[in-house]
Every structure is written in structure tokens, then in C-alpha cells.
């Protein structure tokens, strides 16, 4: 879900025309389109805006680019959907929530035929939702949204990074492995590896009516015990987040970390020729017993899409821009500038994409993934609480596995009203 990861508060709106207007000047004319995008993507969005204007000289466009993190965009959109951005990026796990709030325009007709032909089958499936018995597309995909392993190949070999135990064997308290254990988007990978999961039932309006989760069965207890055994390690940085991970690679205190493509530029800059990436490692379950086994960490796999607000005053123009933004050329450009792996099937064939370290790691990881769709809205806070309790327990040396896990699952299964 996190994919980038936090809402960046404050409205740093940037009004773009053919050039940037001077202070105090106002241009009330033209077709005003507001775009919400992540801070890291702002320069790329600006460049696409300029190209779009050049290709449409017969229209006077006025674009406003506002900073908004992708993963929690639904909260801001639904706070005031009629005045939200015309165009916004979102992770596909927010699709049902946005549709339920009447926030997304359907993609249809020849436009839908074009984007369906251009993008991977899996990415297009992520754009669809069934409402009142009818299946429709509500967004345009442009990249995969998952996580994998970054590592320093001067410290770790390909053999080392195949297993979490192998990674930790080369780590120390001042050269750690990092994983954001306070974030359920990552920690669910332990449970998914053993085919544990959840089920959500919806009414005709896509409101949740019943949620079940089996993370607290006996297998889930064993998984949680394995997680706790790793978190306790001084070589395991469990309180990691994006800023701590990138800073750790910079100063050498982190030699391997679980993260996503959004941190690629910084990590690669810090590691230089020692930069490497791979799928997630396996972890040891039932360690030291006759049932000991290696379990593959299985990541959430979703997609990021561009959506058009159903209340946009310039819906056709917004759809035209969204289609232009997600076309082959711009997906390749997005990859070149930001390392964002394309969903466009022709863009994926680009030689730069084919040879890319992270693109290869993502392709491998997608073989061990769970589609991020139909995720309980109640999932994230309880999972954050479970991980945070482990992190706190690392300091005190105490963590009640069964009690904490039961509390987590009880909170996840709390039915929506």
C-alpha cells in the first residue's frame, strides 16, 4: 500500500504554463487541470505537462501540480471529492474505496481499447472493479507497485541474499539488515509465504460487510514467532523506514534492506558500483525443530494508476492527459528518470528496461507475490501495531506472541459498519 510513501502535508502548488508565471500574476483563463503527484515525481510530471501542451497548441491549458503521496490519496480525495484534483495517482488497493466515494471516471470505448492493448493483462485487471454486476475500468496503469531487496554486493553475495539467515550471517550491529517491521505492507509477506490471508465480503455498493483473517491460527503463531526471533537480532533493523534506509546505505550502517523502486535513485547513488538488487529472501520457520523449513517472503504486488476525478469540470481533457502520461514513450521516460518499471508491454521491451537490475528483481519478485486487491480497510493499523509491539519488545526483551497476534486479528476482523 505504501508504495512512497507518506502523505506530504502542505500545498506546494506549482502553476505551470508554457513557462512559469512571475510572482503576483494570475491567469484565470484557459482550461485549468489540477494534478496530484508525489514529491519525487513532480519534475517528471512537469516535463510531461510541457510536452502535452506542445502537442495540443490549439488549447490553452493551465496545470496546477500539487504534492500528494500516492498510497493514501483516497483519504484526501474523499475528504472533498468535488474539489479534489482532476487527475491523481493511486495504488490499486484504494480502487474500491474511491469507487464507493464516486471519485473515479470510468474508462471506456476506444480509449479503453487502446490502453488495454498497450498494457500488461495483470496491470489492466488491477484497474477493474465490479459494481452492481458490471465490470468497468477506472484507471490507467503505469507501473508495478511491490518491494524487493537492495544490497551492497561488496558485503553480500547472490548466495547470501537467497536467505534471511544468509544475509544476517554477514551483518553486524553496525552493518545491519533493514526491514520496516512497523509497516503491515511489508510484514504481511511473512504470512503470505505460508498461504495465510484474509477474505472480505462486500455489499452492492462495495462497502465491507464481513472480514476474516487467519493470521492467528497455529501456523500464523509460528510465523509470528519466527518474525519475533528475527526482530530481536541486533543485526536486524526493525524500526526502518525510507529515510533510515537511505541514510543507512549512505553511511554504511545498512548493507541490505527491503524497500521499493521509489528509493532506487538514492540507494544506487550511495552504493555506486556495489549496488545490487534481488527478490526477497526466504526465512526460517520452526527453526531448530524437525519441521524446520525455508519460507519465501511473498510481497504484496499491486499497480499504480492514474485516475480522473468523476467531478472534473474538464473530464475529457483530463482523460486525454492521463492517456498521454501513461503512453509507451512516457513510461520509458519515467523509467529512465525515476526507475519506475513500465506496465506498457512495448516499453518493457526497451533494452534499458530489459538490462536493469531492479526491473529484473521486480520480475523475479512478482513470481512470489499476492495481488493487492480486496485488502481489508482494517488491515494496516492492527498490523502496524503488531510490528510496533515487536520493536518495543526488542528493547524490553518481552513480546507476548499469542496475545499480540490475537489482538491484531481481532482488530482486522472488526466488521465495517
Language-model segment annotations:
Residues 51, 55-119, 154, 159, ...:
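Extracytoplasmic "Venus flytrap"/periplasmic binding protein-like
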Amino acid at each position: 500500500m505504501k508504495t512512497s510513501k507518506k502523505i506530504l502535508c502542505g500545498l506546494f502548488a506549482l502553476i505551470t504554463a508554457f513557462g512559469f508565471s512571475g510572482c503576483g500574476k494570475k491567469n484565470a483563463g484557459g482550461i485549468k487541470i489540477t494534478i496530484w503527484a508525489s514529491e519525487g515525481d513532480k519534475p517528471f510530471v512537469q516535463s510531461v505537462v510541457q510536452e502535452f501542451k506542445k502537442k495540443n497548441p490549439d488549447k490553452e491549458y493551465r496545470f496546477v501540480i500539487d504534492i500528494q503521496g500516492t498510497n493514501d490519496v483516497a483519504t484526501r480525495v474523499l475528504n472533498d471529492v468535488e474539489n479534489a484534483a482532476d487527475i491523481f495517482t493511486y495504488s490499486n488497493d484504494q480502487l474500491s474505496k474511491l469507487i464507493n466515494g464516486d471519485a473515479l471516471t470510468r474508462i471506456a470505448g476506444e480509449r479503453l481499447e487502446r490502453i488495454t492493448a498497450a498494457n500488461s493483462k495483470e496491470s489492466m485487471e488491477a484497474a477493474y472493479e465490479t459494481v452492481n454486476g458490471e465490470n468497468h475500468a477506472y484507471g490507467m496503469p503505469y507501473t508495478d507497485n511491490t518491494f524487493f531487496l537492495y544490497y551492497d554486493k561488496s558485503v553480500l553475495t547472490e548466495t547470501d541474499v537467497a536467505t534471511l539467515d544468509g544475509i544476517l550471517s554477514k551483518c553486524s550491529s553496525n552493518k545491519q539488515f533493514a526491514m520496516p517491521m512497523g509497516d503491515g505492507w511489508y510484514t504481511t509477506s511473512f504470512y503470505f509465504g505460508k498461504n495465510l490471508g484474509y477474505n472480505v465480503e462486500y455489499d452492492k455498493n462495495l462497502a465491507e460487510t464481513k472480514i476474516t483473517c487467519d493470521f492467528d491460527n497455529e501456523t500464523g503463531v509460528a510465523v509470528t514467532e519466527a518474525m519475533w526471533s528475527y526482530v530481536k537480532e541486533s543485526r536486524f533493523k526493525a524500526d526502518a523506514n525510507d529515510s533510515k534506509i537511505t541514510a543507512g546505505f549512505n553511511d554504511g550502517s545498512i548493507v541490505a534492506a527491503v524497500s521499493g523502486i521509489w528509493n532506487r535513485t538514492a540507494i544506487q547513488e550511495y552504493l555506486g558500483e556495489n549496488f545490487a538488487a534481488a527478490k526477497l529472501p526466504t526465512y526460517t520457520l520452526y527453526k531448530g525443530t524437525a519441521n524446520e523449513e525455508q519460507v519465501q517472503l511473498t510481497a504484496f504486488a499491486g499497480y499504480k494508476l492514474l485516475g480522473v476525478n468523476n467531478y472534473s469540470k474538464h473530464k475529457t481533457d483530463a482523460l486525454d492527459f492521463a492517456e498521454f502520461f501513461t503512453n509507451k514513450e512516457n513510461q520509458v521516460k519515467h523509467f529512465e528518470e525515476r526507475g519506475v518499471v513500465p506496465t506498457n508491454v512495448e516499453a518493457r521491451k526497451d533494452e534499458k528496461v530489459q538490462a536493469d537490475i531492479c526491473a529484473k528483481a521486480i520480475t523475479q519478485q512478482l513470481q512470489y507475490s499476492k495481488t493487492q486487491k480486496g485488502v481489508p480497510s482494517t488491515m494496516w493499523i492492527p498490523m502496524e501495531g503488531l510490528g510496533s509491539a515487536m520493536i518495543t519488545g526488542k528493547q524490553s526483551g518481552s513480546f507476548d506472541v499469542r496475545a499480540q497476534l490475537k489482538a491484531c486479528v481481532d482488530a482486522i476482523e472488526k466488521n465495517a459498519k
